[in-house]
């Protein structure tokens, strides 16, 4: 019988396999109880082109404490989009890593779209 974590990892594996076939840059989101992380990977999946998280000092200055909020995810989404555009990345595939597209994950994706990333 599968637990919640195994089910999430199975969904993530399926998504990553489909994105790998497309050979495009991938925006990956990882969510914990206290932080949210976002990274843009190259099409081969071995090189990180841009990253942002609520664990960064610059992001923490913008937040009023907790890094596990929708507002924090919005800041991270905007920041990772700016860094990706600076690295020359305009279009990505969104990898939600098996997490539901709701709440913090959705806020990060919406902020990245508003900042100019296309997916």
Swiss-Prot record:
Segments passing through the bilayer: none
Database matches in InterPro entries: Ribosomal_uL18_bac-type, Ribosomal_uL18_bac/euk
Top-rank taxon, per record: Bacteria
GO BP term, example: translation
The keyword Lipoprotein is assigned to this record: no
GO cellular component: a single term: cytosolic large ribosomal subunit
Any one GO molecular-function label of the UniProt entry: 5S rRNA binding
CDD domains the record matches: Ribosomal_L18_L5e (cd00432)
Similarity comment text for this entry: Belongs to the universal ribosomal protein uL18 family.
Described purpose of this protein according to its UniProt entry: This is one of the proteins that bind and probably mediate the attachment of the 5S RNA into the large ribosomal subunit, where it forms part of the central protuberance.
Subunit structure comment from the entry: Part of the 50S ribosomal subunit; part of the 5S rRNA/L5/L18/L25 subcomplex. Contacts the 5S and 23S rRNAs.
Name the UniProt record assigns to this protein: Large ribosomal subunit protein uL18
Taxonomic source organism: Cupriavidus metallidurans (strain ATCC 43123 / DSM 2839 / NBRC 102507 / CH34)
Gene: rplR
